[in-house]
């Protein structure tokens, strides 16, 4: 079973938000998933990104591959969570 981290669409017509899920790569986009590991809402300003970092790390260590979009979201969330470097 090839596990991937990808987005599953939720919300209403013209007002989507997405769940970040761990799922088998053969399942449909909005089909069954193994675990819900976060939320991404691009319609809010600033964008709403809530991730269960420990669970995402678990799935990545177990061999899950993130989709391109999820990889971008993870980088953006890591950058936002990192403390700003002090200016010398």
UniProtKB/Swiss-Prot annotation:
One of its GO terms (cellular component) is small ribosomal subunit. Pfam families: Ribosomal_S16 (PF00886). Gene3D superfamilies: 3.30.1320.10. The keyword Repeat does not apply. GO terms for molecular function: structural constituent of ribosome. InterPro entries: Ribosomal_bS16 (IPR000307), Ribosomal_bS16_dom_sf (IPR023803). The keyword Cytoplasm does not apply. GO terms for biological process: translation. It comes from the Bacteria. Belongs to the bacterial ribosomal protein bS16 family. This is Small ribosomal subunit protein bS16. It comes from Anaeromyxobacter dehalogenans (strain 2CP-C). The lineage of its organism: Bacteria, Pseudomonadati, Myxococcota, Myxococcia, Myxococcales.
